[in-house]
């Protein structure tokens, strides 16, 4: 088969292969295509071949790999850059493009949306500068309001497992406290239920910036402008160091209940400036980022840091994922998303640096089921989807009209984000191969 193009003087013979199921497969035949074709041109060719076999086919964006590396330039430029011979028949693998196929209607808040969490497939959590946490069952549908903070919420975390009937959520706030809430996601369908915290966690001496839940257990960790990381129990029963408030209240759609206060079980000390972000991916390991330009890995049992990475910039966010959940991504006060691989001995330099943003990075998140994919959010108003196999973003989500303050994956195929435009945005239909 010969595919027409502007440059008829130079043709390359290729075979398109895929691991996708029908109807995405094309016949494994050699076709001749122009050497100056780009990714968009390759996508058009594959769509034309599929449409010739299936007239009802709807155009689908594709990405393309040669020897496991994504193509982000013309085919001829790619072959020259990689030293690949153009004389042989090239095998080009195609996958569904990692890009949103649908934008949901925005969910407006009363102030900046400073935190989002998509850990549960049943709902989305948001935290807002109005001091309220919110639970969204879908775009525009707020099922629960988590109330009680006197300052802006900076972070939200899902504490217990996704399949639990009653959900536990932790919120962190600029009022120096954390609050723990319990609610049933299925109980509120036609109205919004207000939920009061069952426990208030006090101990930080400055604004709390981040909260993360232990992957398996009943604890959360928090980070603060007071340069510390605190660990807390989330159980309802009181123990030494906890005091019970006898105050009870019954509000709108709210059951009467008591409220306890908790103190930190322990503190991790070592950072010298604001600890901007924490994640707790393993039972005994916590990672943190700080304005002191460092990323640290903490041993929960000893309370000491076992890894200390410096990048020369104040950091706002950190996450752990990728191959064997061993890669560390962080971003901060420059436009560069950095990725480290601490398994490589003798080096503390990032193994990847992605620099397509034009302002500070506010959030980064690894995809839970992919070794290659992660996202970043920035004050430039954009969210970028990345693949470690190319230096360019796979997709740029540009739906916010102000700074993006938070972002996360949801259900594996959506990105949820919040920003200074006071909106929760949902970008869905993202195909992760």
UniProtKB/Swiss-Prot annotation:
Q: How does it assemble?
A: Interacts with PES. Interacts with BOP1.
N-acetylmethionine sites (modified residues)? 1
| Name of the protein in its database record | Ribosome biogenesis protein WDR12 homolog
- Keyword Lipid biosynthesis listed: no
**Which GO MF terms does the UniProt record name?**
ribonucleoprotein complex binding
Query: GO CC annotation: what is one?
Result: nucleolus
Q: Where is this region: Ubiquitin-like (UBL) domain?
A: 12-96
Q: Which InterPro entries match?
A: G-protein_beta_WD-40_rep, NLE, WD40/YVTN_repeat-like_dom_sf, WD40_repeat_CS, WD40_repeat_dom_sf, WD40_rpt, WDR12/Ytm1
Listed A to Z, the keywords are:
Acetylation, Nucleus, Repeat, Ribosome biogenesis, rRNA processing, WD repeat
Q: Name one GO biological process term.
A: maturation of LSU-rRNA from tricistronic rRNA transcript (SSU-rRNA, 5.8S rRNA, LSU-rRNA)
Q: Summarize the protein's role.
A: Required for maturation of ribosomal RNAs and formation of the large ribosomal subunit.
* Pfam families from the UniProt entry: NLE (PF08154), WD40 (PF00400)
Q: Which PANTHER family match?
A: RIBOSOME BIOGENESIS PROTEIN WDR12 (PTHR19855:SF11), WD40 REPEAT PROTEIN 12, 37 (PTHR19855)
